[in-house]
Amino acid sequence: SFFDDALSAGPFEFLIAIGFSFEYLLTNLLFVPFMSGASFNGDLPTMTFGFSAQSDESRHMTLGLEAIKFLLEQDEANVPIVQAWIDKWFWRGYRVTALVAQMLDYMLPRKVMSWKEAFELYFEEQMLGGLFQDLAFYGIRPPMHVDDAIAEKEILSHQVYWTLYQFSHAAAFTTTVPDADAQNWLSENYTETFDQLYRPLWDKEAKNIEAGGRHFVRGLPQLCQVCQVPMLFTEPGDPTTLCQRESVYNGEKFQTCSNGCQWIFEREPEKYVQAWLPVHQIYQGN
């Protein structure tokens, strides 16, 4: 849905979507830490592809940043317009990185960097501490809902992988219970959350498997109307309560997964009510 959203936007918003959100935010967190993990695990073809792609992305980032500056320099009235696009496309790109988070923490046989560490380095230090310091000259502030993203760095990968594990029959992902070494690594990297919230889930699942009964969730998950990711995320500041936002448009109710996605939906409801949600289509028999 990310690219459908970008391609159906105007040309200048498209520049922000691709040059900022995709080339800068998303690919930094995919092609650098995950491809380093591929290299560390001996997957040289993936590493070669990833680092080659990232060299292209570096040039694209430069182009995207200059395009943003050009728009801002033309007229002061452009600042709130560009700011709103940055707010929107930051959150759209960030939600896509949820898959990268669980890939780093759970799917690499040998771990090289946690999602939390990658997020702190490539987003908090380099983007918030670098890019947005430059853009502050033009009146641009850090994206709306950035605090929600920072608060999720301790829990994001665990929530996503646990959901994929339960819906492996639908997602066609190979998922397994992390072994003792992997769980100890997660405990060391997520000292505030893993042992308290997620190790008990895996301990319980290990007992299920020993008894011959790995569990799956029967049925399919509710999808967010905007990002189309399953509604698996939790309330900001409360990792034990699922986050679900409801908006009404033309008498019909629509569900979103977060404050960010609800804000995006309510800015352009006439666009997002048209979303083609796979789970809805499956239940309709299409």
Where do the language-model regions lie?
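Short, intrinsically disordered terminal segments enriched in charged and Pro/Gly residues
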Residues: 265, 273-281, 285
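Non-heme di-metal
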Residues: 1-223, 230, 237
